[in-house]
Every structure is written in structure tokens, then in C-alpha cells.
């Protein structure tokens, strides 16, 4: 909404500069690429004149953006409003306009060309995946990239393919943002310049990311550059002799246009928006809506100012922020060293501005409900044009203004005096032939066996796309809630895609993949929940199906559950196992490969600084703790299966607490302590099966575990867990000597009824973070001193706890005390932990030693508490403000790792990697906050990015250009590694913020060598 006032700040002859600026733009009156030109200025010399009227509207389907919304704020930065999305270029189709045509791509795999004057479809062409960035028109051709990993040139006249090239390696497809995609998707807008098409391929450096130059005439590769640890996302920008390559949510990079050589990072605001005009560059929008301006040369001064969008002519910048649109005199701004304060010519208040462009003598501003036309020289409003949904993108030429809306509509406005035209035709869905659509034999039974709601289905049924096949596809689409992939021959692909698109299914619920005769389907293993196949494809169906219980194959009409993966690890408790080992038994041998990415994003997740409960994983299910509930995700393809609300369930500062969630080993049941009730949830459907009240009046459930098929729990004061959020509280919990959460009783809930089989109260306190179980025994530290006995808060410091404490072993069957040993441990000032594995009990503690954390580890026999060995170490990182003093050990079959030290489990002697001459310690190669997890052959942790450390050779492998959570969220489970998103509220420059999963054991990703241009 535009408010009815305008502020004219400068009264000098500004319009002369505006006119000169338009003259410099030349007579260009088309919009052939995103934001109008190769510099992404969002300005064109000529636009439609006079009063505009609505001319036509076309429906493109509901957009499906790749990335979720950002977090709802940041405690650490004291930001109490939603963060700005920094990689949101596909919120709706972005149209381009040239030669009387409007062309756009959609997330429904379509490229469509419509007549600019009538909106009538001239042609449409389908890609193998979503088209997330605007096409580019040049020389009578339409150049487009897609998530199928291909760059194509289409004839503007009829949409026929002129050439098609895959710049990245030809690798099996994976699950990406809920779709079947190439592991090397085209996630930058193409730049066409001087007969060259510049493009990127790839999103995850682990799989390889590349910058390429292709000959616009025939698609021949001119040169190729490997980008390293870069995730190219956004529109490529022409910067004269250079290219700006956006890096997703991080800072953009500068590469030489002639050969792709890396020049430097642009020290600008983070995000995918980049604009060049002359020698100046602008970028943003940052996490809080901030644009940065600077000259392109190295070392130039950078100035930041509030803004989310801008349009730039040679003389004027139009800046749009969340409150207003401003016209800035660029020469005055340069004279002021980039400060916009003294360069404002006019400004107009805008509520909810979303897009801004310049077309001729007008500025067009899109908002939630209208497009407003203003005079470029004064800001006076000429006209307001109503629209049905928020404006995402605008484009214009001399005859029309085109607006793309958030609901998928594209609406055009033309001068009122233009010749009347017929409206665009409505998209008609062809009727299905009469008769009830029947699911193929066995599919209904397969769906019952899954009983898990949303998921992925695959049809491998025989060749030929006749009427019967169309009916089968319709039956599968209408008779299940699965997202289906149909494997067809190359000759059938376009027709099947067209059929599915006409029904509104392509993209949103269906994909088509080409299968070559006699070859495996080019798709990663174990990606589909239900596979429909014929007997000749049995082996292929089993390869592609998720392991049981989340996978079913229907072969020749018989539904069979896929076999479970016996090697898959499970993370059923806060620290992995009821024994608190922070480890699983699976292998990480082989090469990590991306299996899926997307899943849930940060918008519902708790602020990372609060260090919430670890996600859990078992039986093909991953459970994440959201701010307001729980989210169940498929571990093999990232599909969000279910989401339930758990009001006031979130606990914070989990290093000082015990786990309050537990997942059954097969993922079929979940138990969650929610205030005074213990909720039992069906893991397949997310439905709440039971709410068990606490058996002791006035108490809440504390620690919850499951060992030997029986639940174990603790009872605490309602105020004991940390549940309040505020900057001051988060800041406190990162300091040293913070209190531990404690319970007043241990108990085993009855299987029937709401009582307890046994209860072991204490006059002092049970320390939640030390409670663990194995082999029919329960272990914990019991504090018995005066301060523990007098406490009524449920929180005590380590010093207060260790005033008089003992390690206690209970019989899990009846709660009897089997043994106890006094615990005197002055070194454990900041944290206490207990873990049990293989008959060994591990006591962990830490203290602040100057600016470093000192770690202390003791190994006792679990049978009687006799001490076997003790070890200690010092964190090499001088930093006590990121939780270094609250780490926990990772207990493995042969080794135990405690942050910087790795020790032999039977002797406590330091472990060294092969070839080490002595003095080795484990130092993470990068930021070292958050805890560690592990398996017998490696450790997982944050080192800036999620990283694998291998015991076999002491090597480090970076998994993804993302930020893990601040406690535990890198899980070695399901045959690989799953990383549910837990970095919500991060404002730093990490390119990707999403959940993801990796498989191990396949061959490493092939790396394409750099190819330099021919001399």
C-alpha cells in the first residue's frame, strides 16, 4: 500500500539528470533477462505510456520455492522479527519480455511462452526438473537452466530444442527440495553476453560445483572452472571484465569473465541480490534487509544501508525498504562516499513493498495488493493497479507491464488506448475416460503397509504410453498421497509430462525420469517408499526402495515390505543410546554422497543458541524438536511425514539436562515429556496414542529413556528445566559454572495404567545429565549434600552437587541399589556427564582453565564401580564463550573421544593417527562449537561446516556449506549421516540452510577438471 504523501527532498534540476540517465540506457525497450539486463539493473529506457489497464492473466500453478522461510528472529543479535530470506529467487515465476513474447519458467518443470498482447500460449516446453530462475532471450533463442542439471537453448518461435548441455557430471539423481533432481542442478540465472552463455552447475561442493561458459550458437563448452567450497545460487551478473557469482546466503564472488578465474569475494551484504552499474556494485539483502554499495575494485569502501530491493539507472538509484521507496542521486551519493543520506531526491512511504523497477519515466513498485506507478522525477503517483496476491517480480517493455504474483498468476497491464484483445484462454484439464479408476493390484496393500502418510512412489511398469498407462498414472495420483515418479522411455517423456501438467500434477506431485532400455534407473539407491514394478525389475525395485519399515515393493501385484538395513545406525535418545554414548554402531566407510536436501527449514526451529534437544532417528524416521512441536521426516528422502504441536514442550540448554524424548529402535513409537504428561506418539503417522500423567502429584517428567524394552524416567520440580527464552538467559547459559538440572526421583513407568513399577526417591538430587542405562542397570550421580537436600529449584552447580555425591547403580527390574561409590572430583567445575557401554562406565567433567577448557575423563567398571583409568586434556581453542566447557565424550567400541583427546578404551592411553610422531591432539579445522558424534571409524562435528574425521588416516571431509546446530544435530544413522536443520537464527554467511542426508559407501563424486579457453 502506498500512502498518499510524497517527500521531495531536493529541488535542483534533477529531471535533467533523469533524462540523461534514460538516454544513456539507450532505446532499449525490452526485458530479455531477469531484472532487465546483464547488470541486473531492473531498469529499461522505455515503458508503457499513459494509463494502464489489466490486459490478461495466466495461471502457472502454485509455486514451490526451494527454501523455507528464515527464522523468526535471533536471540543473540537481539532481533525480534523474522529474518529476511537471502536466497529467495523462485518465490514465483520471473517473466522476461522480448520480441512481443513473455517467457517464464515454473517449478512445475515448464518453460512457457505467451503472447505479450493477448496472453495466449505460443508454446510450452518441459524440462526434467523445476525451472527456478528466469530464462534469458537473445538472438531469437530462449536460454534456460533447470534442476535437471541441463542448460538448453530453445527457439523463441516454437520452443523447439536447439541444443541441450549438462555442464556437470552425469550422476544418479537425488531428492532435492522435495523433488527428484540432478545432484548438479542449475541454480543460477543464466547470463548471455557476447555470444557466450555463462552458467553454473551444482549446489553442494561435496558433489562438485562448476562455473562454465558455453557457446550460445551450439552449446559447446568454452571453459569450465571448479568452484571449490561454493554453492552458486542467484542471478549471474555482468561486471565488465568480470562476473559476479552469487553464493546463496553468503557473500557473492567475483570471477574473471574471460576464463572464470576466481578474483576475490565481494565484501558486501550477504544474499543472492547483486547489481552492477558502471563501476559500482550493490548486493544484499542480508539477514535484516541491508544493501551494500561499493566500487568493484579491490579495497574499495563499502557502505551499507537499509534496503531489500533496488533499481538503478546511470544517474538514479531507486531503493525499496520495508517502509518506503527512495530516489537517490548517484553522483551525490558517490560524492558523499557512498552515504545515501545526502543523496535523497524524493521518498514515498510504502507498506510492504516487494519489488521495484524503472520503465521509461516511471517507477513501478509492487506491494501485497497493488502495483503503483510513480513519476521517476518527483515520486508522484500516476496510478495504482490492483492485483490478487503479493507481487514477486515485475518486467516491462514499451507496450506492457508484467507482474508475477506469489500465487503463481502472471498478470499483464497495457495502455488503455491499446487495441482490444481477447483474454488469454483458460487452461482446461482434459477429462479422464469414464469408469472408476482402480489402483494397480497390490498398491492398496502396499500403502496400508507403509501407513506413514506422505512419501515417494516410483512406477517402473513396462514401456508404452497408451491409454492404459495414462489411467494407471491417474489412479496412482488420485488414490494415494505419495509424490510419484514415472520411469518412461525418452520418446514418451514429453507426452507424459504434458499429460501430468494438464492435470495439475507435474512438479507439485509427479516427476518423469527417462530410463534407457537395459540400464538401471539413473537415481540414487533407497529413495522411494513404494516401488511398483514387474518381475523382471525385482532387483532394481529393491535397490530403489527405502529399507523396511519405510519401504514397500509391489512386484507383479504382490506387496512386500523391503528388508530393514541391518547396518543402519539409530539415534534413539538425546545422546544416541540409553547409555549416553553419543555414537552408533554403523560404518562410515566409503565416500559420503548427497542423498537428499531440503526437508524442514529454520522457520519452525528453535534459536540455535538455545541448544535444544538432539533430533532422533530410527526405522527410517527422523524426529526434530521444533519450537512448538515435533516434526517427523523420512530419513532416506527428506519428506516431511507429519508434524504435531507440543505446547510449551521445548527445553533449552540441554548440555545441563537429560533427554526428554525417546524413540523406539524401529521408529514405531515416540515418547515425549510434555510438562506434566508423558506423550506416546505413533512414529509412522504422528498421531498421539496416549498422554500419561505423572504418578507423583506436583511433579513433572524429567529424563526419559528406554532400555531392555522398558521405559525409565525421572521426576523433577516443574521449574527445573530451562524453558524461558531471552537474550540474557542465553548469554548466562554460555558462561562457566552454570547449574545442572536435577530430579527428585527415578522410576519405571508401568506398562499398564498410569503408575510406576518402582520409584527411587532421593533427599538430595539425581543429576539428569548423568542418568543412563545398559544391560538391565541404571546409573547416575546422586548429590546428598546440604545444598542438594535444601534445594527446591531443581538446579544446582557442580560445586554444590559434588559437596557430597556418589555414583549409584540400580537394578532396572526393581530399582534396588546394587552399588554406589563416593565421587570426589573438584576438577569437574562446569559440567558432569556419565555414559555406559560394554561394561564400562565413563565419567566426564570439565572446568575453565584461563581462556581454555580442561577436560577430565574417568573409566570405571560398570559391574562394581572400580576405577580402571583416568585421562585429561586441554582444548587448543582459547574460547569459553561458545560452550567449550560443556562437551561430552563419544564412546566407541575401541576408543573414547573427549573433544581434543582420543583414548584407547581399555587402557586410556592416547590414540594417534597413522604416521603421527607424537604430540597429536584432535583440533577441529575451523569453529569448534557444538558437540561430537561418532561411529567406530570416525567422528562427526562442526568445523565451520559439518565435518567427518576418519580414524583410518586422520583426514577431515567437509560435508556441506552449511552451519550445524550449536549442540548435537549431525547424526551417523540410516547407513549414512543425517543433519536436520538446527541453525535457525544464524545471520552469518553460510550458503545453505536446510536439512540434508548423506549416504556412504558409493564411489566418490567425479571431479571435472578445469578447462581453460582455447588460445
Language-model features: locations:
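Aromatic (tryptophan-biased) beta-strands that constitute blades/sheets of beta-rich domains
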Residues: 30-93, 100-103, 120-127, 158-180, ...
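Conserved class I S-adenosyl-L-methionine
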Residues: 453-475, 481-485
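A short acidic, Gly/Pro-enriched loop at the edge of an enzyme's catalytic core
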Residues: 518-530
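A short glycine-rich, Lys/Arg-flanked "PGG" loop and its adjoining helix->strand segment in the class I
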Residues: 538-550
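Conserved SAM-binding strand-loop segment of SAM-dependent methyltransferases
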Residues: 505-518
